[in-house]
Amino acid sequence: MNHIDFGFKKVDYTKKQGLVNSVFSNVADKYDLMNDLMSFGLHRLWKDEFIRRIPNLNSHILDVASGSGDIALKLAKKARDRGNNIALTLSDINEEMLKNAKKKTIDLNLFQNLKFTVASAEELPYPDNSFDYYTIAFGIRNVPDINKALKEAYRVLKPMGKFICLEFSKVKESYFKDFYKFYSFSIIPTIGQVITGNKEAYEYLVESIELFPSQDEFRIMIKEAGFEEVGYKNLSGGIVAIHSGYKI
C-alpha cells in the first residue's frame, strides 16, 4: 500500500485527496476570515506581490486550487480597471470552495470572462498548450502528488507560458524560527478552534507547511518538471515564497 503524508499522519495515497477535501469543506465559510486572522492580513500583501508577477493581463490565465478566488478576483479587477481583455479559468477540486469563489465574483460584478472547473491539479481537463499563465496560491502542498501536478502545469501552458506559485516556505532567520514555530503549532490551531470549531483542520495546515519542501528543494522539483529560468523570492523572511518558471 502506498502511504503519503497527511500532515504528520501517514495515509493511503488514494485517501489523501478526500481528507484534504473534507478539511476545506469544513472551514469554507470561515476561510477568508481565518486567513486574515492567522496572517494579520499579510496574506493580502503577499497576494498583491504575487499578481504583480503577471504583467500582461491580455492573457488566458489558469488559477489552480483557486479556493475562494482571491487571486482570480484580484486579477479580474485589475484587468477591468486597466481595460484589459483577460480570460480566467478558476479550478479547484473542492466544490464548496469554488461555490464561494463564484458567489464573490457575482457580488463584485467580476464574472465576465471567468470559467469555473471542479478538477484535480494532477489531472487537468484542458488541452496541451492552452494557457499563458498558470497560477497556484497556497494550494500545491495539499496535492497528493506534487510532481504530477507540476508536470500537468507544464503540459497545459503554452510555449513561453509562465508558472507562478505562492506557497508557505521555510523561515530563514534563526532568531524568528522558534517564535514562528510556537505561533504555528500553538496559536493557529487555537484560533481555528475558536473561529471554525475545527482545530484539526488547522493542525493539518501547520503540519503540511512544516513538511513542505524548502525553497531550494521545490525549485529543483519545478525544474525537473521541465521548466526553465526557475527561481523564487522570499517574502516576510521566508514565511512564504513566490516560485516561478517558464515553459520554453
Curated annotation (Swiss-Prot):
Coiled-coil-forming residues are none
Give the enzyme class: transferase
Q: Does the keyword Transferase apply?
A: yes
Keywords of the record, alphabetical order, are: Menaquinone biosynthesis, Methyltransferase, S-adenosyl-L-methionine, Transferase, Ubiquinone biosynthesis
From what superkingdom does this record's organism come? Answer: Bacteria
Q: List, alphabetically, the Gene3D superfamilies matched.
A: Vaccinia Virus protein VP39 (3.40.50.150)
Its Gene Ontology biological processes?
aerobic respiration; menaquinone biosynthetic process; methylation
Q: Which GO terms describe its molecular function?
A: 2-methoxy-6-polyprenyl-1,4-benzoquinol methyltransferase activity; demethylmenaquinone methyltransferase activity
Q: What pathway or pathways are given for this protein in its record?
A: Quinol/quinone metabolism; menaquinone biosynthesis; menaquinol from 1,4-dihydroxy-2-naphthoate: step 2/2; Cofactor biosynthesis; ubiquinone biosynthesis
* Purpose of the protein: Methyltransferase required for the conversion of demethylmenaquinol (DMKH2) to menaquinol (MKH2) and the conversion of 2-polyprenyl-6-methoxy-1,4-benzoquinol (DDMQH2) to 2-polyprenyl-3-methyl-6-methoxy-1,4-benzoquinol (DMQH2).
What is the similarity comment for this entry?
Belongs to the class I-like SAM-binding methyltransferase superfamily. MenG/UbiE family.
Entry protein name: Ubiquinone/menaquinone biosynthesis C-methyltransferase UbiE
Q: Which organism is it from?
A: Rickettsia akari (strain Hartford)
**Gene designation:** ubiE
